[in-house]
Design a protein with these regions (language model features):
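Aromatic-rich, lipid-facing transmembrane alpha helices and their immediate juxtamembrane interface loops
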Residues: 1-156
Length: 156
């Protein structure tokens, strides 16, 4: 059941992104996706495999749900978040968008725990929220740096 839930969540993230009026260019969206994919994979590896704070399931089907969520769902949600943040005209709107995204990400992890995809040993959903907030801040900073570098005027 965990695979089905994570598949639907990933599919829903892709559909929302597709129907969302994009603020970022296709290159910026690809940059955000690839950077967030790299960060999320590394963070989940460190948390689960190196520090042993989370125990992942040994069931192959449920583990496929984890991989699908980690490799497609979460990076697509990060892309949606960056589009929403850069589209916001006010700071409060951007912060509300980030809060909704954090709630969705923590909710997905909560579903992962409920369907026994992951078992929290020395970890909880609050730590998930903090780590996702840090990852969102890093992606935001890297995207700002990318935009500054790409759109810099060259002297003529």
């Amino acid at each position: 059941m965990g695979l089905v839930v994570m598949f639907i969540a990933s599919w829903l993230a892709i559909f929302i992104f597709y129907s969302f009026q994009e603020r970022l260019t296709i290159l910026e969206n690809a940059f955000v996706f690839l950077v967030s994919l790299t960060l999320v994979i590394n963070a989940s590896w460190i948390i689960a495999e190196e520090l042993k704070l989370v125990e992942l399931t040994k069931d192959g089907v449920a583990y496929t749900g984890f991989i699908l969520n980690r490799s497609v769902g979460v990076p697509m949600i990060f892309v949606i978040a960056m589009n929403a943040v850069f589209r916001a005209k006010r700071v409060w709107t951007a912060l509300a968008s980030v809060a909704v995204v954090l709630a969705a990400l923590v909710g997905l992890n909560g579903l992962g725990v409920y369907f026994e995809i992951a078992k929290y040993e020395k970890w909880n959903l609050g730590y998930d929220a903090i780590s996702y907030a840090a990852l969102l801040a890093i992606v935001y900073g890297l995207l700002r740096l990318y935009r500054k570098t790409v759109y810099r005027r060259t002297p003529s």
